Amino acid sequence: MGGLISPFVGEMLRGEEKYQIIAVEPASCPSLTRGVYAYDFCDTGKVCPLAKMYTLGSGFIPSANHAGGLRYHGMSSTVSELYDQKLLEARSVEQTEVFRAAQEFARVEGILPAPESSHAIRVAIDEALKCKESGEAKNIVFGLTGTGYFDMVAYQKYNDGEMEDYIPSDEDLKRSIEQLPKMVG
């Protein structure tokens, strides 16, 4: 996402344009919408250096029924800083809605999108429907980062009605966030 939005953020910072930039994440791994902005390990093994990010804690693991990609406990440092500076907003979406949007996109565009991209597709569709209702004309750009051909098992679960949404409890997130490294200084 950082590379796609960089030119637009530059224009915003220079005061040339105003854009609505939306970061979309899974409701089952909501680092921006429910995480904390803190230093954390970039890996679950706690070997990599610490980075400042919105995080659920490096020990956070989404439910086994999470099939929608984007399993990482934290958000990139760049996107985290932009969110902290209120240069972008964040939304979380449930995986059944993500796969519904992905199938709609595949029917219309002939491309089976990766679940990761389908989070953005879900919100792009929602934004387009708002424009249709309000009559507002808006250019909507999203990142299509890959195909869903490696995710056929997840698509099959969705088609068979076996996919469930999972949203971690506040207690689950609190437990994980409490394990963040303690910064001194």
Which ranges hold each PLM region?
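Gly/Ser/Thr-rich helix-start
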Residues: 3-4, 70, 111, 147-149
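Short beta-strand segments
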Residues: 23-25, 141-145
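Nucleotide donor/acceptor-binding cores
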Residues: 19, 137-138
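A short, acidic, amphipathic alpha-helical segment used as a generic capping/interface helix at domain edges
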Residues: 95-100, 121-134
